[in-house]
From Swiss-Prot:
Membrane topology: Lipid-anchor
Protein's UniProt keywords contain Acyltransferase: yes
Taxonomic placement: Bacteria, Bacillati, Actinomycetota, Actinomycetes, Mycobacteriales
Subcellular location: Cell membrane; Secreted
Family recorded in the similarity comment: Belongs to the YkuD family.
Post-translational changes noted in the entry: Glycosylated; by Pmt.
The protein's name in its UniProt record: Putative L,D-transpeptidase LppS
GO molecular function term, any single one: peptidoglycan L,D-transpeptidase activity
Signal peptide residues on this chain, from the entry's feature table: 1-28
Gene encoding the protein: lppS
Length: 403
């Protein structure tokens, strides 16, 4: 566009020069005519100099540690690009796209780590530009697993999980590589449970029907400590009906609600009334649902010789990473609704356990109250809502943990 304007300026200058010459011829001042001709000639030379500009490359010759996830762009400063090639050290030519007007060239594939690339660009005016650069060489790379799974329907308490394959030193860089998009828009934020596990949650429970898309574009991102992102990942999910269970030790019952309507109340038996086994109070997020599983007390440090157990159970619905489930306990039906007998789980009858597992989904909420236990840790893995929003919203990307 600048060249086009320059040409217009040259034409206008010549036209004015002709007018000036004609006028000066009438007055007989030939010395003035010579100055005008020199000015016109100077303008033409300037335009030619302006036209003769080499293509501009978005990376500089000799650049190192270039982010391989970023596109490389070549711009014409003249009439358009006639040829652009970009090859790696093995001679492979990178795929590219040329704009419709022929003035902009862009890489069309992701570059690799630890590569050297050379760009050669030629403009239609004959000017050329060349640049060689190298991409970042990570000491290590890591992936990130996302939850919930793509296209799933989850409960109003579902938080978004990001589990990195190795500890992240630069937490802020990791967060900056992630985009959470919701419809409708909601207020939310990130919080780290440890150096490898990051969560995102809204300030309040989701509204049913909310659509959520998550993009973790970590490839090419320096996550600190020599570790870079290996592969991008993404997921999407929808918020389903609001299903919430309230388990109350004062009544030894658990009531289940759907969109505010009571579906069922069932007798339960909580963890024994001791500081060691009492079921923690607080908000739990429903996790895995297992039609059958083996419960082994050694997984949380209780040996068989210390009164531990290895017991097959039916309809076990996960409430915490620390091993708390709602599950069938036919051996404690006599205690259910009357007193507490478990090692922390919520015991119900087989029929109620099956009904409960079919009534809830991942991300639904269970609220436990009035036990003698403490509150489920917000760092448990399914206890995210036990960290107050006033703390969560501040984030903790500037911190690191011991694990």
């Amino acid at each position: 566009m600048r060249v086009f304007r320059g040409r217009r300026g040259a034409v206008a200058g010549s036209f004015l020069a002709v007018l000036a010459i004609g006028s000066l011829a009438l007055t007989g001042c030939t010395i003035e005519r010579s100055d005008a001709q020199e000015q016109s000639s100077q303008q033409s030379t300037e335009v030619e100099a302006e036209e003769a500009q080499a293509p501009v490359i978005s990376v500089d010759d000799g650049d190192e540690d270039v982010d391989p996830s970023e596109s490389v762009i070549v711009k014409s400063m003249g009439d358009g690009l006639s040829k652009v090639t970009m090859t790696n050290e093995e001679g492979y030519e990178v795929e590219s796209e040329l704009s419709d007007d022929g003035r902009s060239w862009t890489t069309a594939e992701t570059l690799g780590y630890n590569r050297t690339y050379t760009i050669k660009a030629t403009d239609k005016n004959g000017e050329t530009a060349t640049a060689s650069f190298s991409t970042a060489t990570p000491a290590a790379t890591t992936n990130v697993a996302l939850s919930p799974l793509a296209d799933s329907v989850v409960g109003v308490g579902q938080t978004i999980g990001f589990r990195f394959g190795s500890p992240v030193k630069d937490r802020k860089a990791a967060q900056d590589a992630i985009t959470v998009t919701t419809s409708p828009k909601v207020e939310g934020g990130f919080y780290w449970l440890n150096n490898s596990e990051l969560r995102w949650r809204p300030a309040e429970y989701w509204e049913p029907g909310t659509e959520v898309t998550v993009e973790a574009d970590i490839y090419g991102k320096d996550l600190g400590g020599g570790v870079w992102g290996e592969t991008d990942n993404a997921t999407n999910f929808t918020i389903g009906d609001k299903v919430e269970a309230v388990a109350d030790d004062a009544t030894k019952t658990m009531s289940v609600y759907k969109n505010g309507e009571l579906l069922r109340t069932m007798p339960v038996s909580f963890g024994r009334d001791t500081s060691e086994w009492a079921t923690p109070n607080g908000t739990y997020i429903i996790g895995d649902r297992n039609e059958s599983m083996i419960m082994d007390s050694t997984t949380f440090g209780l040996g068989y010789e210390e009164g531990g157990y290895r017991t097959p159970v039916k309809y076990a619905t996960q409430m915490s990473y620390s091993g708390i489930y709602v599950h069938a306990a036919p051996w404690s039906v006599g205690a259910q609704g009357s007193y507490n007998t478990s090692h922390g789980c919520i015991n119900v009858s087989t029929e109620n356990a099956q009904w409960f597992q079919e009534a809830v989904k991942r991300g639904d909420i269970v609220t436990v109250k009035n036990t003698i236990g403490e509150t489920l840790s917000g760092y448990d893995g399914l206890g995210d809502w036990n960290i107050p929003w006033s703390e969560w919203s501040k984030g903790n990307a500037d911190q690191t943990s011991a694990w």
